[in-house]
Amino acid sequence: MATYVLIPPAGSGPWYWHLLAEQLRDRGHDVVAVDLPCADDSAGLADYTDAAVRAIGDRTDLVVVAQSFGAFTGPLVCERVHADLLVLLTPMVPAAGESPGQWWGGTGYAQARQAQAEREGWTPEQDQDPNVVFFHELPPRLVEDATANARDQSGTPFERPWPLAAWPDVPTRALLCRGDRFFPVDFLRKLVSDRLGITPDEMDGGHPVALSRPRELADRLEEIRREVCEVARPHAG
């Protein structure tokens, strides 16, 4: 049994993971959906990391899954606790000394989104419409629930440089979604390659994939966990 530690995207709480958590528990795993102080203007990335470490407690066999802006917190958690695996899901891959606020300009994000809008023939209004960019795979009732459970996101953790000088010593994989309209997949492929030196895994789905495809996401996470953790773990006998 593994313990999946789920670190949410910006402006999200444990509810975001509820469908995925059910899938993982059905497979026999423990799940910690971290409740970050995202609306607290006094809280920075160190406070986010503290919240995750407290939630983990004395659990072991950790698989840390950090989505989107959560990718700034996931490696910090793995610097504090021993994790068997870190999975960055549709991630804002951080770089040493770069603040999350600087990430957008430093990665060429705006140009990638503009190129996507031109390919898709979207108007500027469509490119800013959450129903087009985020919720295009979700049924109306789930969109309503997602909107009702959204949280305010403080700008404080975006202001200070990411503190790690080097990536933590943890097996790391990136999982991208080919239908992601917020972080276009070609943009993330290059970012993951440039910053982590790895080839990402991919699956179908849009950015809020834990809501739109929880079963498929659980399957992919389990495939990655088995590849990394069970192969690396020596067999008795």
PLM feature segments, named:
Residues 48, 211-227:
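Post-His helix in hydrolase/transferase enzymes
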Residues 65-70, 74:
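Gly/Ala-rich beta-loop-alpha elbow adjacent to hydrolase catalytic centers
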Residues 168, 174-176:
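Short beta-strand/loop motif that positions the catalytic acidic residue
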Residues 33-63, 101-109:
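Active-site loop/oxyanion-hole signature of alpha/beta-hydrolase fold enzymes
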Residues 2-41:
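Conserved HGGG/HGGXW glycine-rich cap/lid loop of the alpha/beta-hydrolase fold
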